[in-house]
Curated annotation (Swiss-Prot):
This is Capsid protein. Belongs to the geminiviridae capsid protein family. Residues 1-12 have a biased composition (Polar residues). GO terms for biological process: symbiont entry into host cell; viral penetration into host nucleus. The lineage of its organism: Viruses, Monodnaviria, Shotokuvirae, Cressdnaviricota, Repensiviricetes. The keyword DNA-binding applies. One of its GO terms (cellular component) is host cell. The keyword Flavoprotein does not apply. Signal peptide: none annotated. A motif (Bipartite nuclear localization signal) lies at residues 10-35. GO terms for molecular function: DNA binding; structural molecule activity. Pfam families: Gemini_coat. Homomultimer. Binds to single-stranded and double-stranded viral DNA. Interacts (via nuclear localization signal) with host importin alpha-1a. It comes from Beet curly top virus (strain California/Logan) (BCTV). Residues 1-38 are annotated as: Disordered.
Length: 254
């Protein structure tokens, strides 16, 4: 086709449309119709429901004696079962700990002006043995007959990969020299005798415990990672000067 202008002319042609140059259609990957296909269900992130286990210290209101010899106890005594405080499988994860306890000094401690400090540890026993560590010397680098000043205690060199300290803290007891609940004339401003509350929260512990195929919840039923609570009084007079611990520790696990 010719197109004339005043001085010259140009030739133009209609462009032929190639049907193959158009955008290709999207092929269906499945042979079934779309309306008959199964849809994937929508899953929601549900909050994890934790179980609770209470470990009582000092049953019957008597309390557990805390001396310079120390006290070692296992906290995650989860028996296998279907209850809210029992484990359903051989692998558990302890998330949080909550201590609701109280400390009380001995009667001889209140009769004279005294000051005592208690040292507390949360320790993970990674390589559980056949015998429970009843002595402090099996964990700390101290003599077998004990040692004063618990603030200097350190994990044994040959046990530093087995016993892992997760948390430690201190508590104090102070006496004015009068029996608990007794009367005295005014002498000077002083701290009154009292029971020391101990409310400690240990969050995000996330300790994974592997159990043996025994179904029990004792130390010998654990294959890996037992949760230990250790407490020591700094007064070496274990006969007259000691502390008493009341209350329980609640373990949150799944």
């Amino acid at each position: 086709m010719r197109k004339y202008t005043r001085n010259t002319y140009t030739m133009s042609q209609k462009r032929k449309v190639n049907p193959q140059s158009a955008w290709p259609k999207k092929r269906r990957t499945s042979t079934t119709s779309r309306k008959y296909q199964w849809r994937r269900p929508v899953t929601k992130n549900r909050t994890l429901k934790l179980k609770m286990y209470d470990d009582m210290l000092g049953a019957g209101g008597i309390g557990s004696t805390i001396s310079n010899n120390g006290m070692i106890t296992m906290l995650n005594n989860y028996v296998q079962g279907i209850g809210d405080s029992q484990r359903a499988r051989n692998v558990t994860v302890t998330k949080h700990l909550k201590f609701d306890m109280a400390l009380m000094g001995s009667s001889q401690f209140w009769e004279t002006p005294n000051y005592m400090t208690q040292y507390h540890w949360i320790i993970i026993d990674k390589d559980v043995g056949s015998v429970f560590p009843t002595k402090l010397s099996s964990i700390f680098d101290i003599p077998d007959n004990g040692q004063a000043m618990p603030s200097t205690y350190r994990i044994r060199r040959d046990m530093n990969e087995r016993f892992i300290v997760k948390k430690k803290w201190r508590t104090h007891l102070m006496s004015t020299g009068t029996g608990y609940g007794g009367k005295e004339t005014y002498k000077a401003p002083s701290m009154p005798n009292y029971k020391k509350p101990m409310n400690i929260n240990v969050r995000n512990l996330n300790m994974r415990t592997i159990w043996k195929d025994t179904g029990g919840g004792k130390y010998e039923d654990v294959k890996e990672n037992a949760l230990l609570y250790v407490v020591v009084n700094d007064n070496t007079d274990n006969t007259n000067m000691y502390a008493t611990l009341f209350g329980n520790c609640r373990c949150y696990f799944y």
